[in-house]
Regions:
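Flexible, glycine-rich active-site loops centered on histidine and acidic residues
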Residues: 103-150
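Catalytic cores of alpha/beta
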Residues: 102-114, 192-196, 221-224, 244-247, ...
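Conserved N-terminal beta1-alpha1 strand-loop-helix module at the mouth
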Residues: 1-49
Length: 318
C-alpha cells in the first residue's frame, strides 16, 4: 500500500513509523533486524530506509602517497527495503537522492523498485559533499528535489527519459518529500522555503515528512502556513530524541534548528549519557502525546540505528 493509503485507512488514527540507516559495508543486516524487531509490536505500516551519497576517502598507496577515492560507505538501500518487506510484510520507503546520481541511475533504481513491489519513495536533494562549499549535482543528475519529484511523476505517467515504448504496466509511486518547520539551512526565510515545498507538491509529491524539531509550536505554525499557501497533502512530523550531550551542539550546527531552553537545562543537569537519554525519551514522549492529540497522521521517528529509546517512547504513546 501507499503511505497515503495507509493514512486514509487509519481513519484519523495516528500511525507509528520510523527511519533506519543501512549498516556500513562489512556489517551484518542482522544488526538492522535486531533494531527493527522490538518496534514491530507497534505495527508500523511503513519503514523508511536512508540512502547515503558517495564520499571521498584517502587510501594509502604504500609509498607515502594517498589516493583520493570515491566510495559509498552505506550501500544496500534497495536490498534492505526488499529484505524488510519480505521478512516483516511491511511497506518500505527507500530514499532517492539528487546528489551523486544521474537521472538514468535514478530511473534504473525506480524500475527496480517497481519490479520489487516497492511503491513508496522519498525524494530528497541530499547534502553537499564534505569538501564542497555548496551542493553540486552530479553531471546529468537532478538539481533540486522538485526536479526529482517531476522525474518520478513522469515515470508514473509511463514516460521514460530517452525511450519511446508502449507501456502496459505503469509505475504508481507515492512520493514523499522533506519539509522544514525551521526552514532549510540554505533558505533565506521560512516563506521562501514553503514556496520551494509548494513546488515539490505541485510537481507531484503526495506527502511531506518534516525534519526533526523539539518545539511542537514550530510544527503547528509550519502546517498552518503551508495550508495557507495551498499545500494540502499530509504533513508528517519527524521526531528525534536527544541521546547524548553532544547533540546540544551538533544538532543545531548540522540541521540549523533551535533547542528549547527547558530541554537544554534538563540535559545540562544530567551526570551521564544514560540520564541524558532518559531526558530525551521523556521530552519526545510529551511531544508525541501532544502531536497525537492534535490528530497528526503519523508520528515518524528518526532511530539513527538505535531502537531502544524509540521503543520506550512508542510504548507510552501507542
Amino acid at each position: 500500500m501507499k503511505v497515503t493509503e495507509h493514512i486514509e485507512a487509519a481513519k484519523g488514527k495516528t500511525l507509528f513509523s520510523f527511519e533506519i540507516i543501512p549498516p556500513q559495508k562489512g556489517k551484518s543486516i542482522q544488526e538492522l533486524y535486531d533494531n527493527i524487531d522490538p518496534l514491530m509490536e507497534f505495527k508500523p505500516p511503513f519503514i523508511d530506509v536512508t540512502t547515503s551519497r558517495e564520499e571521498y576517502i584517502y587510501v594509502d598507496k604504500g609509498n607515502g602517497l594517498l589516493d583520493k577515492k570515491l566510495t559509498r560507505m552505506r550501500p544496500g538501500t534497495l536490498g534492505i527495503c526488499a529484505s524488510i518487506k519480505h521478512k516483516y510484510q511491511v511497506d518500505t520507503v527507500p530514499h532517492l537522492l539528487c546528489g551523486g546520481f544521474t537521472k538514468e541511475e535514478t530511473e534504473y533504481m525506480l524500475v527496480d523498485c517497481h519490479y520489487l513491489g516497492i511503491n513508496n519513495v522519498m525524494a530528497l536533494r541530499g547534502d553537499a559533499m564534505k569538501d564542497e562549499q555548496s551542493f553540486v549535482p552530479k553531471a546529468g543528475g537532478n538539481n533540486y528535489a522538485a526536479d526529482l519529484v517531476a522525474q518520478i511523476n513522469q515515470l508514473n505517467n509511463g514516460k521514460y527519459l530517452h525511450d519511446v515504448m508502449d507501456v502496459d504496466n505503469k509505475a504508481d509511486f507515492c512520493i514523499g518529500v522533506a519539509g522544514y518547520p525551521e526552514k532549510h539551512l540554505e533558505s533565506p526565510s521560512l516563506t521562501t522555503d514553503l514556496k520551494r515545498l509548494k513546488e515539490k507538491v505541485d510537481a507531484g509529491a503526495d506527502y511531506v515528512v518534516t525534519q526533526m524539531f523539539f518545539d511542537n509550536a514550530k510544527y503547528f505554525e509550519f502546517v498552518k502556513k503551508a495550508r495557507e499557501m495551498g499545500i494540502t497533502v499530509p504533513i508528517i512530523p519527524g521526531i528525534k530524541p536527544i541521546a547524548v550531550q553532544k547533540h546540544l551542539q551538533i544538532l543545531p550546527q548540522i540541521f540549523r534548528i533551535d533547542l528549547p531552553e527547558d530541554l537544554i537545562n534538563a540535559v545540562e543537569k544530567c551526570k551521564n549519557n544514560a540520564e541524558i537519554r532518559q531526558v530525551g525519551v521523556e521530552w519526545a514522549i510529551q511531544q508525541s502525546i501532544e502531536l497525537k492529540a492534535a490528530g497528526v497522521p503519523v508520528l515518524h521517528y528518526y532511530s539513527m540505528g538505535k531502537s531502544e529509546n524509540i521503543r520506550q517512547i512508542a510504548s507510552q504513546v501507542f
